[in-house]
Amino acid sequence: MAVLNSNPEILLRKRKNNDRKRLEKQEQARQRQLEQKKKNDQRSKKFVRAETLVSNYKSNELENKRIKHITKFEKQSQADKISQAKEDDESAKLLFIIRIPDHTKGLKVPSKARKVLHLLRLNRPNTGVFVKLTPATVPLLKLISPYIVAGKPSLNSIRKLFQKRACISVIDEETKEPRITKLDNNGVVEDKFGDDLGCICIEDLIHELATLGEHFKTVSNWILPFKLNAPVSGWGPQAKLAKLQYSNEHQRKISLAGDAKLNEIDIDQFIDEQN
């Protein structure tokens, strides 16, 4: 059994090191904020052509019209939704939702859609979360349909995501601040859910999500959004050309109708390409 060193000099040195690390991290965070503010100031002073302003205005106008149509349609069919609520558990299915870059450059996401994206923790492109699809969640997903792709993942895809991308937030023992760490230890799962949920390994979490178990929400909220690779990366001329070609090939038609359906894709292939 290891004996803890109780030498006052060593304890004082450790305490000073922890204080120094904490101050260094605070200074680094302050520098990042200053750099971000400087970039934002430069971006705000950037010259914008009149044609760009008109294009952005029309795009935002169409997007707001789409949100308005969906909201109106959902209000009118609210009575049907109440009767369907009893069938939620029977008709529910698992979806994996990935946030994609905005379909139109310069588009400002409407507040209702932005709130749904924030609720799902999809604040950045190329991040994904598991969602339990029910009649109650369909209207919310329709609001954000231009900003996401969705589909039913296979058990193999879920396992691949956990093996390569699963991360959680933990409290650092030294700095007492939250930090992100990879979920690759069954002991962490057992310490977190062993007594309450009976989950003692990562495979138990995968089973809970895949089968839409009783503790689906607790497990999915504990795991941070999965960060996927961008389909095309880089900043050089070839990368810009590749991004343009990818954008043209994957251009999506967006319906303004209030009763537009939520389109689902082969999410397994999408995960394989960006995992």
From Swiss-Prot:
Segments crossing the lipid bilayer: none
Molecular function terms from GO: rRNA primary transcript binding; structural constituent of ribosome
Major site of localization recorded for this protein: nucleus
PROSITE patterns according to UniProt: RIBOSOMAL_L30 (PS00634)
GO biological process entries: exonucleolytic trimming to generate mature 5'-end of 5.8S rRNA from tricistronic rRNA transcript (SSU-rRNA, 5.8S rRNA, LSU-rRNA); maturation of LSU-rRNA from tricistronic rRNA transcript (SSU-rRNA, 5.8S rRNA, LSU-rRNA)
Coiled-coil residue windows: none
Gene Ontology CC terms, in alphabetical order: cytosolic large ribosomal subunit; nucleolus; preribosome, large subunit precursor
Residues covered by region (Disordered): 14-45
Alphabetized UniProt keyword annotations: Nucleus, Ribosome biogenesis, RNA-binding
Subcellular location(s) per record: Nucleus, Nucleolus
Function (record text): Involved in the biogenesis of the 60S ribosomal subunit. May act as a specificity factor that binds precursor rRNAs and tethers the enzymes that carry out the early 5' to 3' exonucleolytic reactions that generate the mature rRNAs.
Family per record: Belongs to the universal ribosomal protein uL30 family.
Official protein name in the record: Ribosome biogenesis protein RLP7
